[in-house]
């Protein structure tokens, strides 16, 4: 194994275990980290030989172990053998989180756990009040009043596993250094071995093409924050490098909570951008945007009402302040044409489809 110093960090002899490599976030994060530090020894948990083949084709030196998030004993063992565990898989799987913590806590040396949550955790107020499509002025941040984020109610999405990670970073603070990365709406194409597609905006685009018109939930005034997947991956890279550097300059444990975001957007605006572009590409006939109810949105995709109709606003102060992280990629709006074209391709919908369907071409 060749040792390389990247920005003063020598990563030789560090071993990392990762969960979620073939997913959208994990695929891009691993691509970014492996490009910066090819000398790191990686172990990847994959579900089956098909997934394993895709990882091996792009990363032939990666050690593969086969199992899923229910393979508690395997995850515990692999975590015990790792210096750093990057958890990019299901943010709501309690068993996997417990297994990782158990494995890391059993080590005599200090290790690091970088877990992925999501700002869906901030949706609970609108869900509780059954309010969809209305704007909220409440903006969380990960620096001032961090306890507001780390003490959200237990029924908030992702909160149960967040608590497992936060508790581990407190009870085992001497041996298990934890960080939670909490991304908002993610956009852009991933460069991982399997899934290059995000969810919220692509799903909105898919449904727009299939419905033949744009739509938003309720009044369409809901706010979310957003981040390009490549900018998100840079945050993971900086945390991995901090871990290799003995933890500095990052904070860990109770203060190891990192939002990532570029800016806020309004879902009604995104709906219009998508509809306008879909019409421009000849995929729909009219770019008017209709108002859908909560039930209609949920009928289009799981959690449609929440992810398009509830508010989730956050500021990434900690990563900027401590890690020097800054988003640099294209804006969400700038990526809409490619997203529309990609979703049309996935649906086997050719440009000019709307005119053909109407008998005008």
Describe the predicted segments one by one.
Residues 2-39:
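N-terminal Rossmann NAD(P)H-binding glycine-rich loop of SDR-like oxidoreductase domains
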Residues 25, 85, 232-236, 260, ...:
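Non-catalytic, hydrophobic alpha-helical segments
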Residues 40, 329-361:
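Amphipathic terminal alpha-helices
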Residues 78-149, 158, 164:
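NAD(P)-cofactor binding segment of oxidoreductase domains
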Residues 162-192, 202:
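Conserved beta-loop-beta element that borders a ligand/cofactor-binding pocket
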Residues 174, 188-202, 239-257:
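Glycine/proline-rich active-site loop of Rossmann-fold NAD(P)-dependent oxidoreductases
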Residues 203-230, 235-238, 250:
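A conserved pocket-lining segment of Rossmann-fold NAD(P)-dependent short-chain dehydrogenase/reductase
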Residues 249-250, 257-313:
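Terminal hydrophobic/aromatic helix or amphipathic segment near a protein terminus
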